[in-house]
Amino acid sequence: MIFNYVFSNSFSFLYLMVNVQCRIKEIMYWNICLYWDVFSKLIIYNKVCQFGRIHIFHGKNRHQLLRTCHFTPSKRHSAMSFFEALGAGICAGLAVDLSLFPIDTLKTRLQAKGGFVKNGGFHGVYRGLGSILVGSAPGASLFFTTYENMKSRLSQSGLGLSDPQIHMCSASLGEIAACIVRVPTEVIKQRAQASGGTLSSRNILQTILKSNNVWRDFYAGYGITIAREIPFTLIQFPIWEHLKLKWRIKHSRNKNLAHEAAISGSIAGGIAAALTTPFDVVKTRIMTSQQRLSYVFTIKSIVAHEGFLALYKGIVPRVLWLSGGGAIFLGCYDVILNFMKAEGL
């Protein structure tokens, strides 16, 4: 029910970009109202579990962590828990997209068919930014609210799952939820990036809306995006959580400092980025193509015409982008989440 509601409203965000007569104040007011409507309904359908404090033991069991979990029956506490993940997710998503967008553009142009120069080179590196800003906040917030909620639920499930298994499952479900909003904005962004600076996000959106297969075009590459994001999160989040845990054990603390969360996020993001580059190349080819391509055909075509190493095109900017992105995104999320908990916001 949560996903159905967000799915039905995600294209309202995209439609904003078509209305040329909208002013900035009107857009901001409209977004705030819609965000509140979405989030208030999410709260109704989510009973959030809240982690207790992490206790550090000394002596014989010095390196053993006991995570005491409990359900919080209070609706007020559940809403606070939800809004902590929500607020931190929004800030983290906007921070990483605004700061590292040019690197993402260069990576897309390297991977797109035709090569770097033909697709625009260094010209217009902020093409497609508008679509990402529209989808960034709802996508990131949907991911982290799902991630934190599922961590609590799985810890209380009695299934005997280890921490890495809990992090993997929670992150995977978070990605599936976030991609409902993220994929349409990603399609518009990558087509704008690969246009050589000749098309804006609005132009591409108008073209898609006029096509005979609007839904298919908006969700071109949804399957391969999930196939890329789930392995990425299966690698990134367990590494991130494990490295943060090592910092806490080393310094006998129950929370991480800002630089610890950022460094852990950077390492985890870089490793995951390198290992999942082939998925990203295939996704880029499918999303930037004007024709409907299958995953298998795209992979065979790349290997046959460009060689196996073509599946690793753009690996350097991708690793740089996601290493920096991991530091900003996960570091920012962790710091803001701790701040909101400390201040009771």
From Swiss-Prot:
Pfam families: Mito_carr (PF00153)
Subcellular location: Mitochondrion inner membrane
Membrane topology type: Multi-pass membrane protein
Stretches forming Solcar repeats: 80-153, 162-246, 256-339
GO terms under cellular component: mitochondrial inner membrane
Spans through the membrane: 83-103, 128-148, 220-240, 262-282, 296-316, 319-339
Signal peptide: none
Superkingdom classification of source: Eukaryota
Gene Ontology terms describing biological process: mitochondrial S-adenosyl-L-methionine transmembrane transport
InterPro entries: Mitochondrial_sb/sol_carrier, Mt_carrier_dom_sf
MF terms (GO), sorted A to Z: S-adenosyl-L-methionine transmembrane transporter activity
Alphabetically ordered keywords of this record: Membrane, Mitochondrion, Mitochondrion inner membrane, Repeat, Transmembrane, Transmembrane helix, Transport
The family this protein is said to belong to: Belongs to the mitochondrial carrier (TC 2.A.29) family.
UniProt protein name: Uncharacterized mitochondrial carrier C12B10.09
Organism expressing this protein natively: Schizosaccharomyces pombe (strain 972 / ATCC 24843)
Lineage: Eukaryota, Fungi, Dikarya, Ascomycota, Taphrinomycotina
